[in-house]
Regions:
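Predominantly a Rossmann-like dinucleotide-binding segment in NAD(P)-dependent oxidoreductases
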Residues: 122-221
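C-terminal helix-rich "cap/oligomerization" subdomain common to oxidoreductases
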Residues: 65-67, 114, 313-379
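Contiguous beta-strand/loop segments that form the cofactor/metal-binding neighborhood of enzyme cores
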Residues: 184, 189-282, 333-345, 363-365
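Short acidic low-complexity segments
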Residues: 49-61
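Charged, glycine/proline-rich intrinsically disordered loops and linkers
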Residues: 158-170, 280-322
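Beta-strand-loop-alpha-helix segment that lines the small-molecule cofactor/substrate pocket
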Residues: 60, 64-65, 71-72, 76-123, ...
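Short, Asp-centered acidic motifs that coordinate Mg2+ and/or phosphate
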Residues: 30, 64-65, 145
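N-terminal Rossmann-like dinucleotide-binding module
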Residues: 1-46
Length: 379
């Protein structure tokens, strides 16, 4: 049994509480948040302990892992404070707001013999496991190209001010617009790409603020880029394009093209997403052939797009009984559980150390639109 403490009781914290039930090896020691009213609301809803102060949380002798769910600007300071207190850290993305901050966190953990892991946990999902199995089995031959989409749709045109978490937290829209969709969400694509294809050797990054007016309350804010695209070359030879945005229609799919076929993961925010396989040496499914014939005869594209290939049946049972509600069908607590399990076995967690640093560095480069770059981090 590994005892954890959560710092930050905002919107995302309810996702962690929902999925904590999947992991009997984790015990929640308590929660702290600087907003006393929000802390009372959160702990009362979930029936859990509230720490009286951050110091009390850090000094809890039972706590092995501090889970950092604060806003991104606070990640660096809190990560360092937890490490100085002798705690392992599981941090929401990114580890810091600059490469130097993220690097300092990883170096500090190494010097103190501690471990830092980074979210998100969808890179540990059943869908990623199935996709990796298909690639390793040679079902599409050698993978050459990947397209990862992380488009959230025009969120700022939605009724986002009314969105609430299970325990009543408001969705922090204004702050999300200030931080930007890339730092918030690029990790959901990057975690898959890095897990499947290894470290990035070089890349091209572009970002822009395409909608400077995001409605009431935003006019006095310094808004971050709401669109970014990164073209990444991996040391394994794979080329990938990752797009993040807050305006184009929602699309969180991943397409991988190999010498002999394609894999399409319909939704990276769904741990059991349908995964489609198409082999170039086999006919497409009947419905896809009929759709193609109809389009040729009519000379016009259909008003809907079918996912290429046949859905692949999962050869193993679901690893989580409870997932967060759509559209975030992710076992958020799985990353913490995987970290605890590895530490208890004396192993290195997958998304820790230099790999976690690499993911933060890539997200920061995409968000900043740095142009040509070569990552400093390696693993």
């Amino acid at each position: 049994m590994t005892t954890i403490a959560i710092v930050g009781a905002g919107f995302v914290a309810d996702y962690y509480m929902t999925t904590l039930a999947n992991h009997s090896g984790l015990r929640l020691g308590g929660v702290w948040d600087h907003d006393a009213a929000r802390l009372r609301q959160f702990t009362a809803f979930h029936g859990i302990k509230a720490y009286g102060s951050l110091e009390q949380c850090m000094e809890d002798p039972d706590v092995a892992i501090v889970v950092n769910l604060t806003n991104p600007e606070s990640h660096f300071a809190l990560n360092c404070a937890a490490l100085e207190a002798g705690k392992h850290v599981y941090c929401e993305k990114p580890l810091g707001m600059s490469y130097d901050e993220a690097r300092h966190v990883i170096d500090l953990a190494r010097d103190k013999g501690l471990t830092v892991c980074g979210a998100p946990a969808n890179g540990l999902s059943d869908a990623k496991r199935l996709t990796a199995q298909l690639i390793e089995a040679g079902r599409i031959g050698k993978p050459r190209l990947a397209y990862a989409e992380m488009e959230d749709g025009p969120v700022f045109k939605d009724n986002w001010t009314e969105w609430r978490s299970r325990s009543g937290a408001k969705w922090p829209g204004l702050h999300e617009f200030e931080v930007g969709c890339t730092l918030e969400h690029a990790g959901y694509g990057l975690s898959w790409l890095v897990a499947l294809f290894g470290p990035v050797e070089r890349g091209q990054a572009f970002s822009a603020l395409t909608f400077p007016d995001k409605g009431p309350g935003t006019h006095s804010l310094s808004l971050a880029a709401d669109f970014s695209v990164g073209c990444l070359t991996f040391q394994s030879g794979v080329t990938a394009r990752l797009t993040c945005g807050l305006a184009a229609p929602r699309d969180r799919s991943l397409t991988i093209v190999g010498d002999e076929g394609t894999i399409v993961v319909r939704d990276l925010w769904d741990d059991r997403s349908p995964v489609h396989l198409r082999r170039f040496d086999r006919k497409p499914p009947l419905l896809q052939r009929l759709a193609s014939r109809f389009e040729r005869q009519r000379g016009r594209a259909l008003p809907l797009r079918l996912t290429l290939g046949k859905p692949v049946a999962y050869p193993f049972p679901a690893s989580a009984e409870t997932l967060s509600s759509f559209p975030s069908r992710i076992d958020f607590a799985r990353g913490i559980a995987a970290m605890a399990d590895a530490l208890n076995k004396g192993e290195t967690p997958f998304f820790s150390g230099l790999r976690a640093l690499h993911l933060s560095e890539l997200a920061l480069a995409l968000n900043d639109g740095v142009g040509s770059f070569e990552p400093q981090s390696r693993f």
